[in-house]
């Protein structure tokens, strides 16, 4: 064996050892996060998935019932209404993103009084969602201020029972969510805009680009990843975090006319009825999980395509 | 001398040790602490009591009396603001083995559904309590006369009725104290007269709190008049059909007709301020249980009257009655370490002396048969005395008969029938579907 060969073997042994050490480092670095994910994410999801195939009552009864919970829930007659409500409420996402961009651009360009606007626009975020829900319930109540104003200006025919009809009630809920969220959207987008060199905006202004052209030709194309984050975050939030708004404003009613999938999880688990149908509640949670995953994948693919165009 | 001194010292030390040991063994009793969950409304905590400091509440004072009578026992009061959630919380705590020793829950199906975590009281209830307290059927498993006793009926008896504003009724040309409407036709005609003077006849929040209050407190009486509680139980267990229950369908149809005729406030499915409106004279009637009487009398004074539901079918077996009874119970958790003491506490709260003491703070028709209205200090002909007449002739809560599936539909969708978004038959069929799936 030549000296070169020996040296080469030694080097390769050292290389393998280094690779092993590197792998061990990676493994040990990831281990805490993986363990946390396994315990706090994977285990509950797998348990919920398993429970969704049982008649679990939250206590001792947990017999295998196959797909019965899913089939019964879908066949209940209210499923499609609940799914429709859930999807209608997602309309708040494009609305809040659009208004968020408009507001962020105004703040970025430091219009007169921008400091006050920045503080005011974020205020709803620090108010409890339950309080916001109650405020909107009172404001849009049949005998509330909104209808009083309509009547005062001679539009009494428009003074309807806003929460008495599925579509108008959902419209009010969407409005309240947008009102609540535009501050957050504006701050997120404003944060993204700080990564765009000011010279780009200055050049656009010199070239005669107006406000809307700057919004649609500069901000949106250059902030695809930020918008992707805000759309996914808002979408997931809409699908899973609307409970306090619904509870305060409509309690999912009248009937199930403003109930959503996440509200149904509550109703099946804790609603009046005393049976505590946790089996069905977990089945609804699984359906919601699938919906969240599907919408996230679709949105990410669209964002990737948009980024490619950019 | 030295030996004697040493011996004496040892003897004193020995005697002192024995004395200390004996005193620590025999003199000190084991400390007993009971945790008690109490509903914050419609319970022995009255609605107006909560405006006072907690130590001035009747229940706090009763607890101090019990502690004084039972040295070594301490009671911890935990108020449950959300009664519906209290059931789930109790169940969850029971599963974990740390449920409160005593809990104030609803009678009927709500506690039947929790029997895995509730202690059977069959061998613990004193004979006198069984003799003098009414409403045991509401806490016996399955409503069977020999069913396991899952709890005590709570000390107050809730009698369903309608509170009404005498001034408005008088303005409409009627006097319900002398001549109350007793049939559906008379009731219809009376409500029409109230509407004619520009006042909403009945103000009610029929869905805002997830319960159709008018139906549960008034119309349920009409339903059970025609179907009977046994018939409703057959339906909820899936042995008969709600959709074939003529009494149920007729009651729902009348309920719908009341809305069409403008007898209810227009926004009854979304309103949540009806009691305030009633107290402010914006409505003539408000469906109620006894716990609201004190507040109404305080606001309306002599203009506050009570009206019992008219008879839907004057030829029915059940007449001159109303829905009610002890809607609340006291149960003992299976995991309690002190079952005897827990039952002793509940028995104490239901005792004649405590019932009389409670009446000084809250006024309720009671569940004891050995207390007269005179002992309670009720003026003959007063609203409370009128309601007390039904203390032993009430018809047990219909909605508490419903099992979870049909109950879910009943609570969430009955108001939709009133506003015409659902037909009576559709509601009944939906309840049947749930009953069949149980």
What are these regions (language model features)?
Chain B
Residues 19-111, 115, 129, 176-177, ...:
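Conserved N-terminal structural module of periplasmic/extracytoplasmic solute-binding proteins
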Residues 74, 78, 170, 355, ...:
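Conserved C-terminal helix/tail region of periplasmic/extracytoplasmic solute-binding proteins
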Residues 81, 106-160, 215-216, 305-308:
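Hinge/lid segment of periplasmic solute-binding proteins
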Residues 101, 130-169, 316-323, 393-400:
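A structural signal for short loop-to-beta-strand junctions that line the ligand-binding cleft
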Residues 122-135, 179-180, 202, 223-250, ...:
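Short, solvent-exposed loop/beta-turn-alpha elements that line the ligand-binding surface or hinge
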Residues 144-155, 160, 185-238, 283:
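Extracytoplasmic/periplasmic solute-binding protein
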Residues 188-193, 234-268:
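Glycine-centered hinge/linker elements that transmit conformational signals in sensory
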Residues 261, 298-363:
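Extracytoplasmic/periplasmic substrate-recognition and gating elements
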């Amino acid at each position: 064996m030549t000296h070169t060969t020996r040296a080469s073997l030694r080097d390769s042994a050292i290389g393998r050892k280094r690779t092993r050490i590197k792998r061990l480092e990676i493994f040990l670095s990831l281990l805490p996060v993986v363990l946390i994910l396994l315990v706090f994410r994977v285990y509950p999801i797998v348990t919920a998935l398993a429970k969704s195939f049982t008649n679990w009552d939250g206590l001792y009864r947990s017999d295998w019932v196959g797909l019965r919970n899913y089939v019964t829930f879908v066949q209940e007659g209210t499923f499609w209404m609940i799914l429709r409500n859930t999807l209608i409420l997602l309309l708040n996402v494009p609305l809040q993103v659009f208004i968020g961009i408009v507001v962020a651009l105004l703040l970025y360009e430091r219009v007169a009084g921008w400091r006050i606007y920045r503080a005011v626009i974020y205020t709803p975020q620090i108010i409890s969602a339950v309080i916001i829900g109650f405020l909107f319930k009172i404001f849009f109540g049949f005998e509330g201020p909104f209808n009083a104003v309509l009547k005062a200006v001679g539009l009494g025919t428009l003074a309807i029972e806003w929460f008495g009809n599925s579509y108008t009630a959902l419209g009010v809920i969407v409005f309240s969510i947008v009102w609540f969220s535009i501050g957050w959207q504006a701050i997120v987008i404003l944060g993204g805009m700080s990564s765009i060199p000011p010279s780009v905006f200055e050049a656009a202004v010199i070239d005669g680009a107006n406000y809307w052209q700057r919004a649609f030709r500069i901000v949106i194309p250059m902030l695809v990843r930020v918008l992707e984050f805000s759309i996914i975050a808002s979408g997931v939030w809409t699908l899973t975090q609307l409970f306090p708004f619904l509870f305060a404003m409509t309690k999912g009613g009248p009937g199930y006319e403003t109930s959503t999938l996440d509200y149904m999880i509550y109703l099946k688990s804790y609603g009046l009825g005393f049976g505590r149908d946790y089996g069905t509640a977990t089945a609804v949670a699984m359906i919601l999980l699938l919906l969240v995953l599907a919408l996230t994948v679709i949105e990410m693919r669209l964002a990737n395509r948009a980024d490619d165009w950019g | 001398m030295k030996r004697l001194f040493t011996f004496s010292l040892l003897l004193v030390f020995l005697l002192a040790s024995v004395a200390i040991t004996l005193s620590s063994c025999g003199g000190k009793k084991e400390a007993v602490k009971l945790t008690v969950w109490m509903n914050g409304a419609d319970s022995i905590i009255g609605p107006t009591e909560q405006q006072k400091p907690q130590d001035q509440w009747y229940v706090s004072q009763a607890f101090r009396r019990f502690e004084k009578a039972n040295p070594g026992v301490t009671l911890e009061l935990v108020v449950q603001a959300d009664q519906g959630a209290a059931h789930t919380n109790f169940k969850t705590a029971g599963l974990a083995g740390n449920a409160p020793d005593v809990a104030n829950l609803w009678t009927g199906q709500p506690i039947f559904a929790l029997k895995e975590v509730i202690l059977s009281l069959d061998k613990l209830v004193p004979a006198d309590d069984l003799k003098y307290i009414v409403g045991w059927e509401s806490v016996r498993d399955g409503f069977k006369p020999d069913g396991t006793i899952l709890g005590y009926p709570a000390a107050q008896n809730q009698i369903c009725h309608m509170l009404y504003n005498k001034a408005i009724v008088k303005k409409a040309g009627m006097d319900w104290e002398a001549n109350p409407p007793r049939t559906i036709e008379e009731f219809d005609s009376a409500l029409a007269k109230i509407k004619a003077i520009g006042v909403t006849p009945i103000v009610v929040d029929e869905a805002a709190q997830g319960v159709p209050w008018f139906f549960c407190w008034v119309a349920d009486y009409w339903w059970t008049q025609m179907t009977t509680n046994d018939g409703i139980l057959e339906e909820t267990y899936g042995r008969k059909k709600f959709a074939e229950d003529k009494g149920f369908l007729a009651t729902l149809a009348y309920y719908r007709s009341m809305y069409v005729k403008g007898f209810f406030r227009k926004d009854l499915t979304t309103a949540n301020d009806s009691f305030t409106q009633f107290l402010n004279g914006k409505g003539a009637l408000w469906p109620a249980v006894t716990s609201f009487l004190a507040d109404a009398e305080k606001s309306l004074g002599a203009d506050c009257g009570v009206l019992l539901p008219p008879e839907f079918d004057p030829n029915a077996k059940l007449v001159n009655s109303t829905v009610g009874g002890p809607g609340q119970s006291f149960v003992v958790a299976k995991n309690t370490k002190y079952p005897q003491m827990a039952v002793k506490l509940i028995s104490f709260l239901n005792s004649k002396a405590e019932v009389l003491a409670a009446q000084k703070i809250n006024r309720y028709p009671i569940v004891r048969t050995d207390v007269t209205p005179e002992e309670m200090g009720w003026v003959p002909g007063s609203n409370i005395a009128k309601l007390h007449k039904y203390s032993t002739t009430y018809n047990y809560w219909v909605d508490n008969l419903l099992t979870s599936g049909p109950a879910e539909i009943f609570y969430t969708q009955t108001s939709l029938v009133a506003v015409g978004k659902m037909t009576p038959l559709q509601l009944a069929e939906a309840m049947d579907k749930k009953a069949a799936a149980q």
